[in-house]
Structures are given as structure tokens and as C-alpha cells.
Amino acid sequence: YDDVPFFRLADAYFIKAECLLRLGGYNGESEQVAADLVTAVRQRAFKSDPGKATVTVAQLKGGSRYNYGHRENQGIMGEADNWIITEEGGDDIELGGLLDELAWEFVAEHHRRQDLIRFRINGTNQNVYNGKSWFCKDAKTDKTDRHCDIFPLPKSALDGNIKLKQNPGY
């Protein structure tokens, strides 16, 4: 049927890299292993220039290189004075370099929303999904209810197990 699980080796590498970076290393493996894993994935894209494939721990732990922003036209399309533009950098995102790598590797694979929810803005409990403006979402005026951070349980799962409780807000 159409419910085939799809999991790439690159996904496993990135999951391990994120864990190592968040924990500061684990079980004898250092944060450098995280950088090596991301580099291994990038080598596929940079075969002709392996130097470009190499990433460092500092780059992964640094801020995002994306210029997060929201652009909205308030009038006639094409007239510059009708645009509301809110742009802000991503240098305050924890593990922003890793978030960038996830975006590049898994573009159009339906990872981004959950990544933006999982990653936080440094020094806050605010996730990037609600804390930054992007595409057609203005962070100052368009707040998504935090219950949307997790998905509802399917009705079939609830019907099949009476001990399950629906996630809050659904």
C-alpha cells in the first residue's frame, strides 16, 4: 500500500549528530563525531571539492545563516511601498548551523516544520517555528498555539487502546 516507511542513512547520521551536540558528546564519543557525520553526508554533494564538505563543531553549534523574514504585500502587487518586510537573522538559534544542514539535506522531505519546533532560540524556551518570521508567517502577529507542536493521535489508535488519551487541544 502507500504507508511505506521511508528512512535515509543521512537521517540516522543527523539524528546521532544532533544528540551528540545537545549532550556535549556521549558514551566516549565527542562532539567531533557529530561534525564527522555531517561531513560524511555532505561529501556526497561536494565530490568535486571535498574541502567544501567539511564542517566543524563550531559551525554546527553556531547560529543559522538564514535571514529569517516575512514579506507581505499590503496593496497592489509590484509596488515597493506596499510591502511589509520583517527580516531578522538566525544567529540566536541554538545549533543553528545544524538546523541549516537539516534544511539543505531534507528539502521537500517534510522535515522542516518539526525541525523548527524542536530547535530553540538561545536563552529562551521559544521554538524557531513561533519565534522567527518566515515565508508568510510574521512571528510578531501570527502565533501558533503551542498545542500544535505535537500532532493529534489518530482515531484508530484511540479506538484500539482505551488507555490512550488524546493529546491536549485536540
Which residues fall in each region the model found?
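Long, intrinsically disordered, low-complexity segments
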Residues: 1-6, 42, 57-170
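Extracytoplasmic/secretory soluble proteins
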Residues: 39, 43-47, 51, 104
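Short, glycine/acidic-rich hinge or "gate" loops at secondary-structure transitions
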Residues: 29-33, 51-59
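C-terminal substrate/ligand-recognition segments
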Residues: 1-43
